[in-house]
Structure formats: C-alpha cells, structure tokens
C-alpha cells in the first residue's frame, strides 16, 4: 500500500450520508459542530459557507465540494443578511431524504460525513486545514465530479443497495479530494501528507509503508530515492517534521496499536510483525510514542 491508502485503511474510514438540502430565495441554515468530518457538494446553484473561527466566508459554486476537518459550527446561506434557522429543525422536517430552506429550489446540496477509528485526529485530521475546498474547475477534478454525480443518482433513483453504493462512492470521493488538495495546496498540509508532495520524501515514505518490518537505514532509503543520505534526511525532516527512522518507529507503533485493539495476538508476534526483535524492544518504543505500555493500551485503547 502507499501511505495515503495505508492510513485511510488503518483508520477504518466510513461514510454516512445525510438528507439533501434544497433551498431557494433568501435563506440561511446554521449547523452545530459536527461529530464527524462533514462534507457537502453543491449540485445546483450557488451559496456561501461560513465556519466559526474562519474570518472570510467561502463562495460555493455549482460543482464545488468541501470537507470540514474540525468540529466547528457552520452556516450555509444565500446572503450575509438573512438570519439563520437551526439546521436540526430544518433536517428534522426532511421528507423523502430532502430538507428544505427558504422558498424555491435554486440550490441543491448533497452531504454527509466521514467517521474514522481511533487515532484519526493525530494521524490525519490534524494534518489538514480546517476547511478543504475543492472548486468545480479544479484541474483533474473530473473523478470527484463523477463520484458526486453517481452519489446523486443513487440517492435520487434509489435502486437496490443504493445507500451502500453511495456511501462507498463517498469514500472514493474523499480519496480524490485529498489527492487534489495535495496537488493544489501542498503547503497547506503537514506531516506525512506534506511529504507526499515531495517526490524524494514520497519515495522514502512509500518504502517504509510497504515494508515497515524491514531494518531500514537512511542509506537504504536514500538509495531508493536516488539522493544522498544528507539530502534525504534534510528533506524528510523539513517536510514531515521528523527524521525517516523516527517516522518509521511511529508508524510501526501505529500498526502494533491496531493489532492490540483488534485482535488477540501475543505481544511477541506483534513485535516480530512490525520489525522488533523482542517484546521488550516493542514495549519501550510503544511507551515512548503512546505514553503507556502495550498491555495497558490493549485494555484502554482510546486513552492516548
């Protein structure tokens, strides 16, 4: 797997679709801070997005979509002057999967959210800006538009297994949105995500993710990237925020933590599978990274 696929798989990414929103005239709907990573896509018309803590509203055009990666209240509206109504009330009145605001049907949005397993905040969400906005005219955004159109069709026509298919399509959309964001704004992300935008660092990251149990050295990684050891070490540290071997240690611990959360494998077998020669070596590294011994983590996996 490549690093992005690896992390999204580790986090057990799932999507949840909500009712669509049809609006017209002058309207505004305010939403409480979502407990998931919220997404919306404008399928028809235009509107504004205001997010708590963000100074300027974002103009959304037909075909635009966005992710909210932080739990912040937000408002969708036609104009700045209209007083917002509570989104919970609006969506409680939804019929046939469609909520309505204002008068008319000038605007049509589909939306939902993404949920992740343990460790999502540190591994992924903190690496992204609070808002990831993908305008419809973004280069190479055709696949995002294809996924959104397919979701729209599934929700409109409701063939068999439409919800399941639409939710899987939403995950496909998420991956493409993240790809496009890395292409458009590589400096707006941090950590390993930022590393994917640097071809030298990305090569090293891919090697570490493909074979995390290998006894990698900086020289090995430099050879795969066709640069000197000093160049690789400097670029990796500057981009990712830590050295390649420190990153490897942390990724190994994430893999070990997943096995502790999800299975009954012995600590010895887990240690071997992620590149440690003994239980004690894994235990020392695990406590240094996550702040508790592996045995305690297995009992209380949500504590760090």
Curated annotation (Swiss-Prot):
Residue ranges of DNA binding: 219-240, 267-290
Annotated GO MF terms: DNA-binding transcription factor activity; sequence-specific DNA binding
InterPro entries with a match to the protein in the record: AraC_lig, AraC_XylS_family_regulators, Homeodomain-like_sf, HTH_AraC, HTH_AraC-typ_CS
Keywords from the named record: DNA-binding, Transcription, Transcription regulation, Transposable element
Residue ranges annotated for the HTH araC/xylS-type domain, each copy included: 202-300
Keyword Nucleus included in the entry's annotation: no
UniProt keyword Iron-sulfur, yes or no: no
Alphabetized PROSITE patterns for the sequence: HTH_ARAC_FAMILY_1 (PS00041), HTH_ARAC_FAMILY_2 (PS01124)
Protein name (database record): Putative AraC-like transcription regulator
């Amino acid at each position: 797997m490549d690093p992005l696929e690896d992390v999204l798989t580790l986090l057990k990414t799932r999507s949840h679709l909500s009712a669509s929103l049809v609006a017209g005239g002058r309207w505004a709907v305010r939403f409480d801070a979502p407990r998931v990573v919220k997404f919306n896509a404008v399928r028809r018309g235009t509107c504004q997005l205001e997010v708590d803590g963000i100074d300027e509203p974002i103009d959304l055009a037909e075909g635009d979509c966005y992710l909210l990666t932080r739990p912040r209240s937000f408002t969708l509206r036609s104009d700045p002057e209209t007083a917002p109504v509570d989104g919970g009330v609006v969506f409680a009145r939804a019929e046939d999967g469609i909520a309505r605001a204002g008068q008319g049907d000038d605007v049509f949005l589909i939306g939902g959210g993404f949920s992740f397993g343990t460790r999502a905040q540190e591994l992924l969400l903190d690496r992204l800006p609070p808002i990831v906005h993908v305008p419809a005219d973004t280069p190479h955004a055709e696949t995002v538009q294809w996924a959104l159109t397919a979701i729209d069709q599934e929700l409109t026509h409701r063939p068999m297994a439409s919800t399941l298919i639409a939710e899987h399509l939403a995950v496909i959309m998420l991956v493409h949105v993240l790809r496009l964001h890395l292409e458009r704004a590589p400096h707006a992300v941090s950590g390993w995500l930022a590393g994917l935008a640097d071809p030298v660092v990305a090569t090293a990251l891919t090697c570490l993710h493909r074979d995390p149990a290998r006894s990698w050295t900086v020289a090995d990684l430099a050879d795969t990237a066709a640069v000197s050891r000093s160049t690789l070490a400097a670029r990796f540290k500057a981009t990712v925020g830590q050295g390649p071997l420190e990153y490897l240690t942390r990724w190994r611990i994430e893999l070990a933590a997943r096995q502790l959360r999800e299975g009954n494998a012995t600590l010895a077998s887990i240690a071997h599978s992620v590149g440690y020669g003994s239980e004690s070596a894994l235990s020392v590294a695990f406590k240094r990274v996550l702040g508790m011994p592996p045995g305690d983590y297995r009992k209380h996996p949500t504590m760090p």
